[in-house]
Structures are given as structure tokens and as C-alpha cells.
UniProtKB/Swiss-Prot annotation:
Effect of C85A: Loss of function
Root EC class: transferase
Protein name as catalogued: Ubiquitin-conjugating enzyme E2 D3
Modifications made to the protein after synthesis: Phosphorylated by AURKB.
Pathway: Protein modification; protein ubiquitination
EC annotation from Swiss-Prot or TrEMBL: 2.3.2.23, 2.3.2.24
Gene behind this protein: UBE2D3
Classification via SMART domains: UBCc
Stated consequence of mutating D87K: Abolishes affect lysine reactivity
Top-level taxon of the source organism: Eukaryota
GO biological process: apoptotic process; DNA repair; negative regulation of BMP signaling pathway; negative regulation of transcription by RNA polymerase II; positive regulation of protein targeting to mitochondrion; proteasome-mediated ubiquitin-dependent protein catabolic process; protein autoubiquitination; protein K11-linked ubiquitination
Keyword list, A-Z: Apoptosis, ATP-binding, Cell membrane, Disulfide bond, DNA damage, DNA repair, Endosome, Membrane, Nucleotide-binding, Phosphoprotein, Transferase, Ubl conjugation pathway
Effect ascribed to mutating D87N: Does not affect lysine reactivity
Length: 147
């Protein structure tokens, strides 16, 4: 079941890739993918290329994939291990969701962080109290780690 669904998503991605994103299997393991997200133009991550790993559980799509950044990023909802705080990867997962939709949700999270549900409270505090500083550090990290 999982493999059939993963193969379908792969062909859908090839046919209709989401803007600024790409994803596909690492080697022959269909349950382990690498994804790429281009830093959105209207964000301090503009110009950066961010890599993520995607691990599908054997009971996918009934359980969400594990998605994590491998490129370091300065963001209140993404910690230094690359873990992403995004409701659809946890409690709000639905089998109707696809990797394409997950990647687009992560892109929109880059444009619009959610400082009220942070993984990194200190970055959330800076985002809320000193947006210029947040944008400056985000741009510095993007130049340092994602270019």
C-alpha cells in the first residue's frame, strides 16, 4: 500500500512539481527521499537552497512522513536538529495530504513563521520583538549555510 502511494506521489511530482520545491528518492530506497526548497523571494531566505530528508513510515499515508531540514536555518519553528514544528506533520496529518502539499506548507512557513508555537522560543521572541534583527540573522544564516 505505502509503496504504491509513494510511487504515485513521485510521478505526480515529476508531472506537476510544486513551485520552488523538488523531491525524490535517495538511491533505490523509495521510503527515503531528499527534498529541496528554494528560499521564497518574499522572505529573508531568498536565494538559499535548503535540503530536507523525508522518511516515509511503512504505514504511509495513514501516518505522516518524517520531514527534517538538513541545511541549517534560523527560524522559530525549525530547531538545530532540523525538526519542523508544523501541525500537518503531527496532529493535523491526513492521508489526503501529499508530499507536494507538505513542501508547499513548509515554504509558506518560511514566509510566515508561527512564533506562538515555537520550537526555538528565543528566535520566536526576536521575531516578535525585533523583526529587523530576525531578518538580518536569517539572511546571514542563509548566506552562510544555504548558498
Amino acid at each position: 500500500m505505502a509503496l504504491k502511494r509513494i510511487n504515485k506521489e513521485l510521478s505526480d511530482l515529476a508531472r506537476d512539481p510544486p513551485a520552488q520545491c523538488s523531491a525524490g528518492p535517495v538511491g533505490d530506497d523509495m521510503f527515503h527521499w531528499q527534498a529541496t526548497i528554494m528560499g521564497p523571494n518574499d522572505s529573508p531566505y531568498q536565494g538559499g537552497v535548503f535540503f530536507l530528508t523525508i522518511h516515509f513510515p511503512t504505514d504511509y499515508p495513514f501516518k505522516p512522513p518524517k520531514v527534517a531540514f538538513t541545511t541549517r536555518i534560523y527560524h522559530p519553528n525549525i530547531n538545530s536538529n532540523g525538526s519542523i514544528c508544523l501541525d500537518i506533520l503531527r496532529s493535523q496529518w491526513s492521508p489526503a495530504l501529499t508530499i507536494s502539499k507538505v513542501l508547499l506548507s513548509i515554504c509558506s512557513l518560511l514566509c510566515d513563521p508561527n512564533p506562538d508555537d515555537p520550537l526555538v522560543p528565543e528566535i520566536a521572541r526576536i521575531y516578535k520583538t525585533d523583526r529587523d534583527k530576525y531578518n538580518r540573522i536569517s539572511r546571514e544564516w542563509t548566506q552562510k549555510y544555504a548558498m
